[in-house]
Amino acid sequence: MSFISAAPKAFGRFWSAEACFRFQSGGLPPHSKFATSWLGAGKLPRYCRRFFDSKCSIWMFVLLLFTANASAQTNQSRSLVLVIGAAGEAEYGEQFSKCAGLWKEAAAKGGLQVTVIGEDKDKPDEDLRRLLEVVTNEVAKPAGELWLVFIGHGTYDGRSAKFNLRGPDITATNLAAALKPCRRPLVVVQCASASGPFLSALSAPGRVIITATRSGYELNATRFGNYLARAIADPAADLDKDGQTSLLEAFLAASREVQQFYKEQGRMLTEHALLDDNGDGLGTPPEWFRGTRAVKSAANGKSVDGIRAHQVFLVPGEQERQLSAEVRSSRDELEQKLSALRLKKKEIKEDDYFAQLEVILLEMAKLYDGK
């Protein structure tokens, strides 16, 4: 793939206004190793050199390196466990079925192996047993993303939050225990009412947790799950125009739709979705984001939520599929380092900032130059 052919979609991930990690300094100092080794040595085509000459974002160049030198993707098994809860009423049953259908369709496009809990009409009372069995088997696998999506109703009695299955319900505590040994990248989407307590129970490093409500006391039936199912593979939700819709982008799109629904109906908003991907168990509401970047600081000095969720795609784009698992993992780690550095920009001296920035960018250059 040439730099020029890679460029249009490459810009999107880091270049859309207020949605990318832009370093607006105008480029690296001319004496830096990065500038002299790549710019001075003539390793950049004129197309890329123009970006530096015109003081465009360093990120443009970095991403062009990603796409131009990407190797074939290493196939790691990705799994989706889709849990359909007890409907209670026929109307909800139809909604849940439609929502599940959208997830299945998206998972097929993304190449995930799909297991569905809650559709077996012969043994409806065994949903809990089967769910725990499936989770145990999936947790034992060594690699590949694991997605758990819950579509249904939930309850909360002030002590325990539950997701309503057709037989015995599963509690947040039960699910947390089952997932404790998991070392795979994990995504849990809990679309039910009263789902807030699941976020704190399941939160841990390396996980992305989304709940339809911010507490167990938001007990009314939720609409967030319906909108999220529509957004998860919808190009219209792709805020940064990189050819794929991240989990963060889908979360933000669904949240906007929920707010619009209640506004048009003239009703009080009774559900407030949260996203947690930094492991602090607190969660971040959609209002904290401008574009795909959180504009408020996380508590206790933690990194802000949203960075990891913006690196997760149920349906990866064409360029994302070309990256090997190893390259993708290294890229994600470097992106997180850059984000952390960006947060400290006002606290450190400019020279120190550029020195640290240069180290990270050199790592990126070596990663894609095969050194």
Predicted regions, residues:
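Glycine-biased, low-complexity coil/linker segments
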Residues: 7, 14, 18, 30, ...
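Loop/turn elements at helix/coil->beta-strand transitions in domains of secreted/extracellular proteins
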Residues: 76-80, 110-113, 141-146, 182-187, ...
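Functional beta-strand-loop-alpha-helix junction segments that form "active/interaction loops"
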Residues: 91, 102-144
